[in-house]
Amino acid sequence: MLAVAALLVIPAIVVDPKVSAAAPRQMEALTRGVVAVKVSGGVFVSWRLLGGEAANTGFNVYRNGTKVNSSVITTSTNLLDASGSSSSTYYVRAVVNGVERPASNTVSVWANNYKDIPLDKPAGGTTPSGESYTYSANDASVADLDGDGEYEIVLKWDPSNSKDNSQSGYTGNVIFDAYKMNGQKLWRINMGKNIRAGAHYSQFLVYDFDGDGKGEVVIKTADGTVDGIGQVIGSSTADYRNSSGYVLSGPEYLTVFSGQTGAALATTNYVPARGTVSSWGDSYGNRVDRFLAGVAYLDGVRPSIVMSRGYYTRTVIAAFDFRNGSLTSRWTFDTNTSGNSAYAGQGNHSLSVADVDNDGKDEIIFGAMTVDDNGQKLYNTNMGHGDAMHVSDLNPNRAGFEVFKVNEDTSKPYGAQVHDAATGQILWGVYTGTDTGRGMAADIDPRYPGAEVWAGSGVGLRTITGQLISSTPPSSQNFGIWWDGDLLRELLDHVWSGSAGVGVGKIEKWNYNTGAVSRLLTATGTYSNNSTKGTPSLQADLIGDWREEVLWRTEDSTKLRLYTTTDVTAYRLYTLMHDAVYRLAVAWQNVAYNQPPHTSYFLGDGMSTPPAPSMYTTLPQASFTEVGTANALLAEQAALEEAAAAPEQEPAPQTGLETDPQPEPETTPAPEQLPDNSVPTGPVDPSAAAQAAPGAAMRALLGQAAPIL
C-alpha cells in the first residue's frame, strides 16, 4: 500500500464571479409523489415540494379522508402517522395563504420500504459462434413518458455476453423497455445485431426534448434496430459484424423515439461519424466506439442532446436539438479542428453538465476539459483521462462549482485533484504515481465545511480544501445517497461475491468519529449491476420528499425493486428533480461508468437555504389534478400580494381553484421566448415570501422537527 501522498496546493487566482443571467428552464410537471410505508411506529408518509411552489407552501395530510395533522405542516414534507395502519390510504393537500388546494393522488400503504416493479424479461439466444446467452436488467433512467406527472422507467436489458470494447466476441442484442411504476410495459426497442452490447456502446437519454410534456428516448441506432411499434430502421437484413464480433462498418444513426409508444420519431446520421477506425487510437475497434451522452440547456431555456465519440485520443462532441419533430445540428466540437488539438485525450468514462461559468447556459465537463455552451473550448487542465468525476458546489465557502477528478495517467502530477469548474484552475492535488481508479465526493463529516473527497492510491480522506482527515478513507468509492434524516450523504455500494460474480446492494453510514461504517440497508434479494463497479439500475429522487430512492434488479431480473427511506427528517427541500444540475445528472447517470448525481448547490451539514428552482413547465394536455395546482400557485401568490399592496382594490377572486384541476393563470415569458404552450412556474419574490411568512425558509431547512402524529 502506498503511503499517503504529498498534497500540492496551488495559489488561488481571484476571479470575479459573473452575475447569473439564468432564465427559467423547461422542467417536468410532476405530481405530489406521495408515498406511504408501514413502519414499526405507524405509517411513514412523505411527498414533494415542487419547484413551482412558494417556499412557505403548507400541507395537510389525510388518512382515509380525515386530516391527520392538527396544524398546517410548513417545516417538512414528511411525517410519521402513529395511528396509520397497513389498510390506510393517504393523500396530501397543499395550503397556500390559508387556502387548501386540490388533493394529490390517493396512495395505499407499502408493506415494506420497497416496491417490486414486474418486468417482462426477454428470452435469451445464441450467437453465430454458438454461444448461448441470457438477459439481466441493467441501467435505467426515468422521465414522464406519457404526460401524467409520474415517472416511467426506461430499462436497458444486458445480455450475459456483453463486452468491454477491449474484448472480442459476439454479443446478444441490446434491448430497451419502458415501464410504468406498476409494471405495465409500454414498449420494447430491439437495437439489432449491428449494435454491440457493453457499457460503452448504448448510451441512452430519457428527457422531454421537444417540450410537449412527454419524455423522448435518444439512442445511437443502426440498420436492423426495431422500434417500439415494430418498424425497422434501415435494412432489416444487413449484418456488419466481423469475425471478432466488432461492428466497424455500416451506417450509424441517431434516433429519437417516442417515450410513450417507442416509435421512431426522427433519425439522422450519427455525429461524430466513425470514419477511419485507426484515427481514434487503435485499429481493432476499442477506442473508436467509446461513446458518451448527456442533456444540456445550451440556450439556457430548453434541453439539447449531446452525443460524443472518443476520449483516449481524438474526441468529437456533437449537440442536437429535437424541436417540432425534427433533429437539427447545433454544433460540433472536434479535437482535430485547428486550435483544439491540445484537448485530445482528456475525456473520462463519463461526463457532467452544469452552468459552470454562471452565464445561464450549460457547459459540458468532459473529464479534464470543458466545452462551452456554444461548442467552443472553455479550458483544459491537461490531466488526461480518468474513471471518476464529481461536479457540484463542493466548497460552499468559495464561489462557483468545483470538480473532483481522479486520473489514470501515471505521468501526471496529480492522481486526484480539485479544480475550479469555471476556469480549470487546479486548486490542489495529490500525486500518486499510479492509476487512481476510483474516487468519491460527498459531505460525510460535519466537522469540516463542504464535501469530503477520497480515493485509493494513497489519496486518503480529505476536506474539500485538501486537508488530510485520515489516511484510511471509506472503502466505498462508488455512489453517495441522501437517505437518512440528516444532511450528510450516505454510501451506496454492494456486497461483492467474487465466487458468484455478483453483488448485493447496500447503504451504509460513515462514522466520522470511529472511521468505520454502519449498515443501514442490505437489499437482500437484489443484485447490483456492472460487475465489480456495483452500481444500481438507478439512484434518484423519484418519489416522496427530497431524499433519494434506489432501483436494484432482483436476483432473477423479473423485477426492479424500488427502495425508499422511512426515516423522518426535519429538513425540507424542493424535490431534487427540479434542480437543474441534479436532473441532468440523473439523465447521464447511465452513461459508461455510472456516477452519482449531485445538486447545483451545496447540500450537506451547515448548508445555506438553497435558491428555489427557476423553471417553467409545458402542459398541452395535462391529465392530472396537481399540474393545474402547481402552476396556479405562483399566479395565486402574486395576485394575493398585489391585492394586499393595494387595499383599495378587491382581493383577487379565489373561487374555482378548489375544484378546477387546470386553472389558467397569467403567463410571463422568459427572457428568451418560450414555447406558446409554456406555463412559468418560477419562484416567488424571496422578499415577498419572507413578508408572508418571516423566517419560513430557514425554519424549513434548519429549525423544527417533522411532526410525529
Write out the residue ranges for each language-model feature.
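C-terminal segment of classical bacterial N-terminal signal peptides
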Residues: 9-19
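Short beta-strand elements bearing conserved aromatic residues within extracellular beta-rich modules
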Residues: 58-61
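Beta-propeller-forming repeat regions
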Residues: 24-33, 42, 49-54, 74-76, ...
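Sec-dependent N-terminal signal peptides
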Residues: 1-7
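Short amphipathic beta-strand segments in non-cytosolic proteins
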Residues: 63-67
